[in-house]
Amino acid sequence: MIDVDAYAKGVLDGKRAIVARAITLVESTRPQHRALAQELLTALLPHSGRARRIGVSGVPGVGKSTFIDAFGTMLTSLGHRVAVLAVDPSSSRTGGSILGDKTRMERLAVDPAAFVRPSPTAGTLGGVAKATRESMVVMEAAGYDVVLVETVGVGQSETAVADMVDSFLLLTLARTGDQLQGIKKGVLELADVLAVNKADGPHERDARTAARELAGALRLMHGKDAVWTPPVLSCSARESTGLDTVWERLEQHRTLLDSTGRLTAKRRDQQIDWTWSMVRDELLDRLRTHPGVRSVAPDLEQRVRDGELTATLAAERILEAFGDPSPGSPG
């Protein structure tokens, strides 16, 4: 039997074993756990919200795990308590790719001032993002004052992470020719700070050149009147150089948000967006598992595939089977 009060006290006391159990509870999709998880989160919510929430993404091969290990270790040496969470929609298929990352984060994984949590295997991006957001509440209530949320893998995970953090850090590499090559379309717009990693040895000069070129491109993209133009820095996670400057720029961004009132507004907007996102996910789940929908969906899908039925008509029939009348229809 789960004692929610005992869990809440253990989390607030910063007991690692209880924190891990609390996160397992909020990640659970079992109906009997969901009510208990919400009760626990309601108790912890007043004690959360004071941490710096930072999203970390990167181009393939950038050395994200090595960066987070070095960056997080630097932060704990400065007296911070660091939590690392991940949004990995593929984790249910791969068995949790950040499990491998955790072993690569050799220093943070054993640092008493850090907590590295594998990505929840919730299957869908919505499910993973929900579990990560709720894990963040637990981590903050437990006293972790820096939460690093890593994007792993595919699709819209960057956008999902940007919607739950204060600042978004994008890691990239020096490339010959086009410095924007390899950065997914749309991800650049999310970035608040960029860092060209692996600025060491023979690559150091290339990394500095790349940082200058990217900074110029961003100035053009954001315009002269932008309140914040994302700075572009060079760093080496392997040699732990330039990481302090990355932290300084992230702190400057947070200070700007805080001093203009945008931090509070941003977090409130994120909560409202999150509320409606959960409504959409829950409705979609109910619709897909509805007996009436399940009985008609295979035939309708086949008819759409065969070109016998338009997608719009198929959607209307699915909604009729769900028992949700169209707008304007009686009853």
Feature locations, PLM:
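Flexible active-site lid/hinge loop adjacent to a nucleotide/diphosphate
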Residues: T176-R205
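Alpha-helical scaffold elements adjacent to nucleotide-binding pockets in ATP/GTP-utilizing enzyme cores
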Residues: I98, S135, A160, M164, ...
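Canonical P-loop GTPase G-domain recognition
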Residues: V193, A199-L257
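Nucleotide-state-sensitive switch-loop elements of NTP-binding domains
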Residues: D3-D13, A17-A51, S57-V62, I68-S157, ...
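Generic preference for hydrophobic
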Residues: V116, V187, V232-S234
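Long, well-ordered amphipathic alpha-helical subdomains in the mid-to-C-terminal portions
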Residues: V19-R21, S234, T245-G323
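Expand to "…catalyze enediolate/carbanion chemistry for C-C bond making/breaking, isomerization
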Residues: I2, A6-D13, T42, V56, ...
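Short, charged early-sequence alpha-helical segments and their helix-coil boundaries
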Residues: A37-S48, I54-P60, T310-G331
